Amino acid sequence: MIKVAVNGYGTIGKRVASAILAQPDMTLVGVSKTSPNYEAYQAQKMGINLYVTKESLKEFEEAGIKVKGVLEDMIKEADVVVDATPNGVGAQYKQVYSSMGKRALFQGGEKANVADVSFSALCNYDEAVDKRYVRVVSCNTTGLLRTLCTLNRVSKIAKVRGTIVRRAADPKEVKKGPINSLVPDPASIPSHHAKDVNTVLKDLDIVTMAVVAPTTLMHVHLLDVTVSSPVTKEDVLSVLSSTPRILLASGKSKVSSTAEIVEVARDMGRPRNDLYELVVFEDSVSVRGNEVFLMYAVHQESIVVPENVDAIRAVSGFADGRKSIEMTNASMGIGKGYLV
């Protein structure tokens, strides 16, 4: 069993912790929190071992939250640490993980040089095997890479031009916006997403633009992909529908918005309304010669969760990427084919 610690129990950390609990080959040592908020109370109610920094011990005691120990105790017990701390904090913790001889995963908010390799399970699982430090790319980059590495199986990609409509905040983030504006993110081109894709697909010609929209549900990507040889729409739909972690939303289902996608997730009984899969609007898929056009939605809170699980196996020396993906998908109910 791989013993895993999760440093940070926010949007990503709590989902990764739940995913670890579902794995047949992993055990959750515990999670860490810096403040005794509702997430800490929920972790306690779920029976998850809670670890805190030495500085916050008294605050947790005063809040009546029982802790298992301090952060260093948790790290000491683990084989792998999943760092789910806020952007930039993970790089600071790397020294701690290194000094204690632990392998660690970092999230996409960290700079690429924090790790030995940036990771996307469908693209470069093999590159992460036995590495000490792996960075799981961000939600948007995960969506881009999952799509591009899938399309690349039909015809080698020559170039990509993409527009990303980013959600303004997660549903719980009450202090973020905008609430009545569209904001270029940034106005200069390319956006950072193209550069991040190149940390995995290093030679790909890709340019992205991004805008922040006043919504909390999902991101939406609009891609124009030029491939090296002509393909058909049927070729594209076939590879998309047969690839794990990608779902098609058909026009017949009347699912035509991110709101309806999230509603389907609710109706499916998904924990926290999560959709680990990329959701492609089937009617958007169009082919003109060597160009493939499509639109898809990315659930920013959960798309990276199965990627973290696979990365845990990779750094632990599990060499069979396809098998890892199958194990993760089976344990978490992750599908392929059609959303409805």
Curated annotation (Swiss-Prot):
<keyword id="KW-0324">Glycolysis</keyword>
<dbReference type="InterPro" id="IPR020830">
    <property type="entry name" value="GlycerAld_3-P_DH_AS"/>
</dbReference>
<feature type="binding site">
    <location>
        <begin position="11"/>
        <end position="12"/>
    </location>
    <ligand>
        <name>NAD(+)</name>
    </ligand>
</feature>
<dbReference type="GO" id="GO:0006096">
    <property type="term" value="P:glycolytic process"/>
</dbReference>
<dbReference type="GO" id="GO:0008839">
    <property type="term" value="F:4-hydroxy-tetrahydrodipicolinate reductase"/>
</dbReference>
<dbReference type="GO" id="GO:0050661">
    <property type="term" value="F:NADP binding"/>
</dbReference>
<dbReference type="GO" id="GO:0009089">
    <property type="term" value="P:lysine biosynthetic process via diaminopimelate"/>
</dbReference>
<keyword id="KW-0560">Oxidoreductase</keyword>
<keyword id="KW-0521">NADP</keyword>
<dbReference type="InterPro" id="IPR006436">
    <property type="entry name" value="Glyceraldehyde-3-P_DH_2_arc"/>
</dbReference>
<feature type="binding site">
    <location>
        <begin position="138"/>
        <end position="140"/>
    </location>
    <ligand>
        <name>D-glyceraldehyde 3-phosphate</name>
    </ligand>
</feature>
<dbReference type="GO" id="GO:0047100">
    <property type="term" value="F:glyceraldehyde-3-phosphate dehydrogenase (NADP+) (phosphorylating) activity"/>
</dbReference>
<feature type="binding site">
    <location>
        <position position="167"/>
    </location>
    <ligand>
        <name>NAD(+)</name>
    </ligand>
</feature>
<feature type="binding site">
    <location>
        <position position="109"/>
    </location>
    <ligand>
        <name>NAD(+)</name>
    </ligand>
</feature>
<feature type="binding site">
    <location>
        <begin position="193"/>
        <end position="194"/>
    </location>
    <ligand>
        <name>D-glyceraldehyde 3-phosphate</name>
    </ligand>
</feature>
<keyword id="KW-0963">Cytoplasm</keyword>
<comment type="pathway">
    <text>Carbohydrate degradation; glycolysis; pyruvate from D-glyceraldehyde 3-phosphate: step 1/5.</text>
</comment>
<comment type="similarity">
    <text>Belongs to the glyceraldehyde-3-phosphate dehydrogenase family.</text>
</comment>
<keyword id="KW-0520">NAD</keyword>
<dbReference type="GO" id="GO:0004365">
    <property type="term" value="F:glyceraldehyde-3-phosphate dehydrogenase (NAD+) (phosphorylating) activity"/>
</dbReference>
<protein>
    <recommendedName>
        <fullName>Glyceraldehyde-3-phosphate dehydrogenase</fullName>
        <ecNumber>1.2.1.59</ecNumber>
    </recommendedName>
</protein>
<feature type="binding site">
    <location>
        <position position="300"/>
    </location>
    <ligand>
        <name>NAD(+)</name>
    </ligand>
</feature>
<dbReference type="Pfam" id="PF01113">
    <property type="entry name" value="DapB_N"/>
</dbReference>
<dbReference type="GO" id="GO:0051287">
    <property type="term" value="F:NAD binding"/>
</dbReference>
<dbReference type="InterPro" id="IPR020828">
    <property type="entry name" value="GlycerAld_3-P_DH_NAD(P)-bd"/>
</dbReference>
<dbReference type="GO" id="GO:0005737">
    <property type="term" value="C:cytoplasm"/>
</dbReference>
<dbReference type="InterPro" id="IPR020829">
    <property type="entry name" value="GlycerAld_3-P_DH_cat"/>
</dbReference>
<dbReference type="InterPro" id="IPR036291">
    <property type="entry name" value="NAD(P)-bd_dom_sf"/>
</dbReference>
<dbReference type="Pfam" id="PF02800">
    <property type="entry name" value="Gp_dh_C"/>
</dbReference>
<comment type="subunit">
    <text>Homotetramer.</text>
</comment>
<dbReference type="InterPro" id="IPR000846">
    <property type="entry name" value="DapB_N"/>
</dbReference>
<feature type="active site" description="Nucleophile">
    <location>
        <position position="139"/>
    </location>
</feature>
<dbReference type="InterPro" id="IPR020831">
    <property type="entry name" value="GlycerAld/Erythrose_P_DH"/>
</dbReference>
